[in-house]
UniProtKB/Swiss-Prot annotation:
Species: Gallus gallus
Binding-site residues, 1D-myo-inositol 1,4,5,6-tetrakisphosphate: 17, 21, 25, 265
Region spans: Histone deacetylase: 3-316
Predominant localisation class: nucleus
Protein name: Histone deacetylase 3
UniProt GO molecular function: chromatin binding; DNA-binding transcription factor binding; histone deacetylase activity; histone deacetylase activity, hydrolytic mechanism; histone decrotonylase activity; metal ion binding; protein de-2-hydroxyisobutyrylase activity; protein decrotonylase activity
Localization (cell): Nucleus; Chromosome; Cytoplasm, Cytosol
Free-text function comment from the UniProt entry: Histone deacetylase that catalyzes the deacetylation of lysine residues on the N-terminal part of the core histones (H2A, H2B, H3 and H4), and some other non-histone substrates. Histone deacetylation gives a tag for epigenetic repression and plays an important role in transcriptional regulation, cell cycle progression and developmental events. Histone deacetylases act via the formation of large multiprotein complexes, such as N-Cor repressor complex, which activate the histone deacetylase activity.
Catalytic function, reaction form: N(6)-acetyl-L-lysyl-[histone] + H2O = L-lysyl-[histone] + acetate; N(6)-acetyl-L-lysyl-[protein] + H2O = L-lysyl-[protein] + acetate; N(6)-(2E)-butenoyl-L-lysyl-[protein] + H2O = (2E)-2-butenoate + L-lysyl-[protein]; N(6)-(2-hydroxyisobutanoyl)-L-lysyl-[protein] + H2O = 2-hydroxy-2-methylpropanoate + L-lysyl-[protein]
Coiled coil: none
Length: 428
């Protein structure tokens, strides 16, 4: 039976700019959306211009002082916020840039609306590639993330769902989400990530398992450099299969950070786009309501390829290896294909013995769980969102390609030999 897929895209979200030289480039979202349009994948989905989250929405997880600061600070007045900038960890990795709060509002609102639509059974799968900012903490920004849209979306899902499973395939540990739900059995967090050698954020070893009611409901899969498709699959599928069997989630949130691909500007894994997509396809195969989010990914042309390919998997539509012509076509030179070779010469340091040891430890921890913990569900409060449905595009107009204004900042999108941001400084 075909799944109903809701797709959330704000035409302005790709216009925000963290600053010259910063590896996080929201413009990758415009590039992804362009491919989704030109491949015709929008025809297989319900396309929404998303709700914009309010301060109240963000304060469901974050502190009021922190969100008030994000709303007030700007490049023009930040000199008056020196104490707050330090207190809230806003500065180098998480800079103040024009429209910062608006950017947070747009990506968070889309995740929130996706959760609400899943709750109301409007869709089976909700996609927000702008979301997935998993490092943000209750009181501070972290790792290019300001507002944790994932936590806020999960809190919305918990109104209707007794158990939510969170899966994270970003190369970085999903520390902000784990921390938020560390003491509860209502959410199980599973993160596959690079661990060791002071790799950011430095958390996520196998022995972080949760505490109090949440003991054994945080599951970490610490990986070493150079993991390839075969090794990743050897762990991912059996672990997720066992987790779903033991935990019996009624909804899944999947963070699809694309920095786990080979040749990522900040990564050190060796996954292909197909290998990354295989994880998405496997999670989809459980036929459990699914919220799909973006995350990291810093070689932008490959991020767009990856998330477009994964959109095609989610709507069960085979798409051509040759990329369709679009306004961004030249960014995919020289091959102009969906699945270029992204492998590197980084050695796979994940031996079969090491992977089997991780798997064994995880399976032993899973045996400590109560099968499918039961929770008392109280009266469901009204939906967080009361967005105006007139904002939804007319289905008859979804096929038209809007002429969005897409200003590009200098150095925003170079991705090759002349990249002033040194985007290609990856060992090949």
């Amino acid at each position: 039976m075909a799944k109903t897929v809701a797709y959330f895209y704000d035409p302005d979200v790709g216009n925000f700019h963290y600053g010259a030289g910063h590896p996080m480039k929201p413009h990758r979202l415009a590039l992804t959306h362009s491919l989704v349009l030109h491949y015709g994948l929008y025809k297989k989905m319900i396309v929404f211009k998303p709700y914009q989250a309010s301060q109240h929405d963000m304060c469901r997880f974050h502190s009021e002082d922190y969100i008030d600061f994000l709303q007030r600070v700007s490049p023009n007045n930040m000199q008056g916020f020196t104490k707050s900038l330090n207190a809230f960890n806003v500065g180098d990795d998480c800079p103040v840039f024009p429209g910062l709060f608006e950017f947070c509002s747009r990506y968070t609102g889309a995740s929130l609306q996706g959760a609400t639509q899943l709750n109301n059974k409007i869709c089976d799968i909700a996609i927000n590639w702008a979301g997935g900012l998993h490092h943000a903490k209750k009181f501070e920004a972290s790792g290019f993330c300001y507002v944790n849209d994932i936590v806020i979306g999960i809190l919305e899902l918990l109104k209707y769902h007794p158990r939510v499973l969170y899966i994270d395939i970003d190369i970085h540990h999903g520390d902000g989400v784990q921390e938020a739900f560390y003491l509860t059995d209502r959410v199980m967090t599973v993160s596959f990530h690079k661990y060791g050698n002071y790799f950011f954020p430095g958390t996520g070893d196998m022995y972080e398992v949760g505490a109090e009611s949440g003991r054994y409901y945080a599951l970490n899969v610490p990986l070493r450099d150079g993991i390839d498709d075969q090794s990743y699959k050897h762990l991912f599928q059996p672990v997720i299969n066992q987790v779903v069997d033991y935990y019996q989630p009624t909804c899944i949130v999947l963070q699809c950070g694309a920095d786990s691909l080979g040749r990522d500007r900040l990564g050190c894994f060796n996954l292909s786009i197909r290998g990354h997509g295989e994880c998405v396809e496997y999670v989809k195969s459980f036929n459990i309501p699914l919220l799909v989010l973006g995350g990291g990914g810093y070689t932008v042309r490959n991020v767009a390829r990856c998330w477009t390919y994964e959109t095609s998997l989610l709507v069960d539509e085979a798409i051509s290896e040759e990329l369709p012509y679009s306004e961004y076509f030249e960014y995919f030179a020289p091959d102009f294909t969906l699945h270029p070779d992204v492998s590197t010469r980084i050695e796979n340091q994940n031996s079969r013995q090491y992977l089997d040891q991780i798997r064994q430890t995880i399976f032993e921890n899973l045996k400590m769980l109560n099968h499918a913990p039961s929770v008392q569900i109280h009266d469901v409060p009204s939906d967080l969102l009361s967005y105006d449905r007139t904002d939804e595009p007319d289905p008859e107009e979804r096929g038209s390609e809007e002429n969005y204004s897409r200003p590009e900042a200098a150095n925003e999108f170079y991705d090759g030999d002349h990249d002033n941001d040194k985007e290609s400084d990856v060992e090949i």
